[in-house]
Amino acid sequence: MAIIHPKVRGFICTTTHPKGCELNVRDQIEATRKLGVREDGPKKVLVIGASSGYGLAARITAAFGFKADTLGVFFEKPGTETKAGTAGWYNAAAFDKFAKAEGLYSKSINGDAFSDEARAKVIELIKNEMGGKVDLVIYSLASPVRKLPQTGEVIRSALKPIGQPYKSTAIDTNKDTIIEASIEPATEQEIADTVTVMGGQDWQLWIDALAGANVLAEGARTVAFSYIGSDITWPIYWHGALGQAKQDLDETALRLNQKLAGEVKGGANVAVLKSVVTQASSAIPVMPLYLSMVFKIMQEKGVHEGTQDQLDRMYRDRMYRTDGAPAEVDEKGRLRLDDWELRDDVQNACKALWPQVTTENLFELTDYAGYKKQFLNLFGFERADVDYDKDVATDVKFDCVEL
């Protein structure tokens, strides 16, 4: 038991609130339920990177939107009697509790999702507990490091531009001030390493392993999540080292799509999602300012979505349409859920606003207050229905295999 308040260092909140995290998950489940439960979608779903952000939302839509059995893989720190674990641990615990209450199969694996050991355990569980096959594999890993399964070498990714230094207005989120950020370009080695960590190599290893073990159902599909963004963030993102990794993901999708079409009459796509507040996005310089602006503009236009809205739309309007039509894709075969964010009226409003923002008017011209609240929400804080001066149990156990 402990009394827990937020402590923020840099772009990380070092504390988490178990009760707040549970209520966040409950709210996401309720939002999905409101759209109605369908029986005509995925039935057995594997989510790689299932404990927060888009991966968690994908698991929630599968279970509570389509009554699917789910297996989730993630790398989180469990809580102990005296110390809170990571937010993802409590998210996964809450998901498991609510799924089981609904009579759905739910199992989780806590370990390095980049490892062959994790793949072997997943295959074993699919064979022994999930009827032998899965029909949807969601790939949603966001990690700054990857340990290569063959050699054990640890590779790190770099959030850097390519070619020349990147200079831009940004928010110092610790001081709530507008600053000039400058980031030196990535070296060739850093670019290659970023592709190794964040590209499609591991996704390919997962699908190869699952296909090789014959645990992919007829018609099985796989989706990996990506972000492209607008030209406002391109220098650091799409045209930076990370963009090279995401292009590698696109190429991997084309290969996997051919493979699955041939082997199980299935398919593979990259899904390009909108920018949202996640632990991953807050680490990208310039993103907090861009998010604060784009949220305000999209709210004013009535097209703002959170992680759960995006995933509900991906399943319902793209992948599993009630009219049975194939999903709408772009020229690279990608599912585009960033369509509303990239509307000309939204982006032009952002570009007009960008040069006007100063430390003095930051809270007034943008939804930076909303950004900050959502950031703390990720860790279970800033909820009106939680008394943060009360003791809360930190040692939460659930149906999770520790690797």
From Swiss-Prot:
Do you know which InterPro entries this protein is assigned to?
Answer: Eno_Rdtase_FAD-bd_dom, Enoyl-CoA_Rdtase_cat_dom, FabV-like_NADH_b, Trans-2-enoyl-CoA_reductase
Keyword annotations: Fatty acid biosynthesis, Fatty acid metabolism, Lipid biosynthesis, Lipid metabolism, NAD, Oxidoreductase
Q: Where does substrate bind?
A: Y227
**What EC numbers are recorded for this enzyme?**
1.3.1.9
Pathway(s) per entry: Lipid metabolism; fatty acid biosynthesis
User: Which catalysed reactions does the entry list for this protein?
Assistant: a 2,3-saturated acyl-[ACP] + NAD(+) = a (2E)-enoyl-[ACP] + NADH + H(+)
Q: Which Gene3D superfamilies match?
A: NAD(P)-binding Rossmann-like Domain
> Which residues of this UniProt protein bind NAD(+)?
49-54, 75-76, 112-113, 141-142, 246, 276-278
**If you read the UniProt record, what top EC class would you report for this enzyme, in one word?**
oxidoreductase
Matching Pfam families, A to Z? Eno-Rase_FAD_bd, Eno-Rase_NADH_b, Enoyl_reductase
Q: Where is the active site?
A: Y237
One GO term in the molecular function aspect is:
enoyl-[acyl-carrier-protein] reductase (NADH) activity
Recorded family membership: Belongs to the TER reductase family.
- Entry function: Involved in the final reduction of the elongation cycle of fatty acid synthesis (FAS II). Catalyzes the reduction of a carbon-carbon double bond in an enoyl moiety that is covalently linked to an acyl carrier protein (ACP).
Q: How does it assemble?
A: Monomer.
Write down the PANTHER family for this protein, in alphabetical order: ENOYL-[ACYL-CARRIER-PROTEIN] REDUCTASE [NADH]
User: Could you identify this protein by its name?
Assistant: Enoyl-[acyl-carrier-protein] reductase [NADH]
Q: Which organism is it from?
A: Pseudomonas putida (strain ATCC 47054 / DSM 6125 / CFBP 8728 / NCIMB 11950 / KT2440)
